[in-house]
Amino acid sequence: MKKQHSKISNFIQKIISEDIQNKKITHVKTRFPPEPNGYLHLGHAKSICLNFDLAQEFKGTCNLRFDDTNPKNEDTCYINSIIQDIKWLEYKWHNKIRYASLYFNKIYQYAIKLIKKGLAYVDQLSPEEIRTFRGTLTTSGIDSPYRTQSIEKNLNLFKKMKQGKMLEGTACLRAKIDMASNCITMRDPVLYRIIFSKHHQTNKKWCIYPTYDFTHCISDALEKITHSLCTLEFQDHRKLYEWILKKIDISCNTHQYEFSRLKLEYSVLSKRKLNLLVNNKVVNGWDDPRMPTLSGLRNRGYTPSSIKLFCKKIGITKQENTIQLSFLESCIRSDLNPIAPRYMAVIHPIKIQICNLSDNYEEILNIPNHPTKPNMGCHKSIFSNTLYIDQNDFYENKSELLKKLAIGKEIRLRYSYVIKAHKIKKDQNNNIKTIFCTYDKNTLGKNPKNRKILGVIHWISEKNVLPARFFLYDKLFTIQSPETVKNFLQYINTNSLVIKYGFVEKDILTNISTTAYQFEREGYFCINKNFSITKNLTFNRIVTLKDKIK
């Protein structure tokens, strides 16, 4: 088997490469095993990209398997969302979608096998007592009084559990390993528990369900996964993973390897904390564009290739580190910059009146859709006597240092003429209503002689405007590491969404199917498809520009 790339970029690639060279394996098989109890986020994207890309690189296969072992928290809506997200990332899993529940009969038989070998027992301690008996990092655990039950009694009790003759929480099946182990995971972990809930795949066939730890390794073995990849919090579970596979005598060549989980600035990636954001109505659902979920990022305007570029660039290591938000933003900029057509949008409009032009004057200007790609063509704009510029581009007190329009100062309108401000008109609240200017007709595409013009600003003609709403998104938290604080909801950025009403060029309607636009000097935007394009045209700001020309 030949690799597609000779360059080794992470330790897992190196392990796989060595396994192939040493003929430990002949075919690489990975898997992405989400629990269908929530929506995928950026942390999951890291795992998705790792597993699918490794399989592709080494010409192997990657399975999609739902680890559906807890019907209380699972739902088909999560399954559908996960499938949609993986398809959106443009990955294809091997053959059909798999479910751990398809293996429940086999897993049950393996549990019986452990009981018969004296390696599992039915414990009737309460969940609270089990936690207490397990001990701590500094104290050994205590044997359950049910640990020494006969094999026959354990088989009978486990059968009663399966038949629904025991109440939820009154009994569980535990592995008999070592209550004095330094690894708490190995202190007689629970293998099966009673759950009287309808399962989305098996309906009411089962009332006992295997735990994640018991199911996961067996599912990997049954699917002949060669490299089972998970995050570092499962490092201590590897001993149990290997113990189970060894004790049930299953033929397999699968091994678990761990890598660091993703941590991102100004974000939380804990499913519990994301759930709190939704339930406390901090955000408008799991697909809110401020959320780090894949559905949220998709609604924000992030592209599959930008997410995959991000996951590739952050790399795979065992070292825990927090990724800067700017790193993610640079990936979407890199992706959109070559393809996004340029338009002008005025988000904070203020009126400009050109005094030396008549009311009926119109001049058609051809504006390039991309500054470096002539093949992307042009669109038409109108220059007239009434324009709109951004409020932030006018400074009432003249300053030669600021590249802004001011009374007595000149500035260039992008792709157009140089204008000079002479006076302003204010409303009753002392807000500037109109700026009266003149234009220099000899400055189209060239600078005036003997005059230095500082600054270029964007604009739109009143005869070429399309009213629009702009959703300006920002960081959801005011602190860099909200994951590390107890009361993280106290640090919500109340300005994470600011709504503005302004204008965009009419010609944008001819490019309505475009993935994203660059609004010059403002950032990258996409159309918010939750609102009518004809009645309530709304744009989401995906990301600001790295360097604004102000």
Swiss-Prot record:
Lineage, top ranks: Bacteria, Pseudomonadati, Pseudomonadota, Gammaproteobacteria, Enterobacterales
Binding site for ATP: 35-37, 41-47, 231, 261-262, 269-271
Gene Ontology MF: a single term: glutamine-tRNA ligase activity
Protein name: Glutamine--tRNA ligase
Native species: Buchnera aphidicola subsp. Baizongia pistaciae (strain Bp)
Keywords: Aminoacyl-tRNA synthetase, ATP-binding, Cytoplasm, Ligase, Nucleotide-binding, Protein biosynthesis
UniProt-listed Enzyme Commission number(s): 6.1.1.18
TM stretches of this protein: none
Uppermost EC category: ligase
Subunit structure, as described in the record: Monomer.
InterPro entries per the UniProt record, alphabetical: aa-tRNA-synth_I_CS, Gln-tRNA-synth, Gln/Glu-tRNA_Ligase, Gln_tRNA_ligase_bac, Glu/Gln-tRNA-synth, Glu/Gln-tRNA-synth_Ib_cat-dom, Glu/Gln-tRNA-synth_Ib_codon-bd, Rbsml_bL25/Gln-tRNA_synth_N
